[in-house]
């Protein structure tokens, strides 16, 4: 590897700030520094205090009034090659025509932004000497406060960002650095590739869990008085891409427990957006506008000292003082440039909704107490206010609109309720208002129709009548749903006294003449189903010539089966028609406690209603229920398999009860 392909990199910064560290172990007395410098030989520069990874040497050490400052030189092609190959070129995709040297400075500045001084431990009562300082290590974050370094290609540019450094100190550094560099010559450091790789990887691994490291670096950079640094990502001038600018963190003022407020240097290059009231003459060259991220601050000269003082007096009280930092972590510092852009962008956007209270010429609305009775028709009130249910039309802000009728007493029909509405309704609000108005109009006729009705009486009357079923419950003309067996009158004539008396004695049952047609239709359907079941069983019932015990000729009876034949019985063997089937008894005797009820049935063949004989008793019904339960254990029942409660039995019971109630 040719060293000429990779030029030397100069590094500069404070190794320690006097009085900044409260820890006794990290705090260095100034008298010890004065006793230790100048060193007999240039101190080596390594990475993370690894002695086998030396990459440069210290050129100059000075005792500045703020702390120990150094200037060093790094000339290690192995480290440069490792960083260049490890870094992705996509980092610089947004930067055009960037030189390889600038890329190297970006990488090394952000990968090793801090420095750490290694010094010998002094025994109690021991004084420092020339062997007190051991070496200088490049690292991500040093333990001492304010130990942020800068990298550049020349010694002058490396020490330029340190504004706290006095001109005499800068001159001493440059002179000592040139002398040491002349003694070293073109010295190149070649650590092993394995050592440099472990050192660079260890820096990333050891600090990967460091929280808010860029914020800490930014604060320590300000403590060191670094302004206008070009390559450090934590500085305000670093901008690899628009999304990677550090303006959001660089404006954070240094707040640290161990920081000395007297040693904190205030930022002198705050970005200021020139307002129309300001001119280029009012802003000196000491303040950058923020448009050019790679320009440095010019050197301060005595001629412009008074102007810079006046300018700083305008900037520092509001933005650059430590006392202006809000308490807690709920606030952020925003650069003036970004803030002015937001304000100007917001001011340039026109508002879509005009302020009617400002643009309107009409007087403020005063609700009327009581209107004159001579006023008829509709009452006009200013737009923006409307009676409930009468929305204000959109787009008529400067006109008086008729809003709602009034009664003869001068007030509103629903009371003087006036509600302020918004200046303009959205489509959804307009639809809701229209729907509410339609519902109000439809409800009004219904209320007038039922006014005075029995269903709209007082609570006491409804409570007394609720104990009995009203004889005239169906008053509406709508076709309400009804269940089988219930009857609904087709006419709405007032009930007679005889019907009221009949209802009280029969418990609300209707007469047979009204329920007959419905029951005839239902019985015809049942008869058809019975005939279909008979056909599916495959057996023709034998016709008997015997007469029934009630004098009814044979052939006039409809077959009535109370249950299917039990298993094992021949399907053709059945009880003769017209003959009453004996009720099975547990004692082997035929039950005599039975009731014969003639029920009219529609005979499709005869075309007229004929009576059938149905013998029903309590013991027979109990026997049928037990027999059905025993059969359900041997047969497939869809409702039982489905696991749903059976409702067919309840329907049959209701049907039979309705039939028996109207006889």
UniProtKB/Swiss-Prot annotation:
One Gene Ontology cellular component: host cell cytoplasm
Catalytic residues (UniProt): 49, 116, 135
E.C. no: 3.4.21.97
Site feature (Cleavage) residues: 234-235, 638-639
GO biological processes: nuclear capsid assembly; proteolysis; viral release from host cell
Pfam families hit by this protein: Peptidase_S21
Region Interaction with pAP: start-end pairs: 329-348
InterPro entries the record matches: Herpes_virus_sf, Peptidase_S21
Keyword Hydrolase attached: yes
Residues covered by region (Disordered): 444-471, 486-512, 583-608
Any one GO molecular-function label of the UniProt entry: serine-type endopeptidase activity
Region described as Interaction with major capsid protein: spans on this chain: 643-663
Family: Belongs to the herpesviridae capsid scaffolding protein family.
Domain notes: Region of interaction between pPR and pAP is called Amino conserved domain (ACD). The region of interaction with major capsid protein is called carboxyl conserved domain (CCD).
HAMAP family recorded: HSV_SCAF
Protein name, UniProt field: Capsid scaffolding protein
Annotated organism of origin: Gallid herpesvirus 2 (strain Chicken/Md5/ATCC VR-987)
Gene this chain is encoded by: MDV038
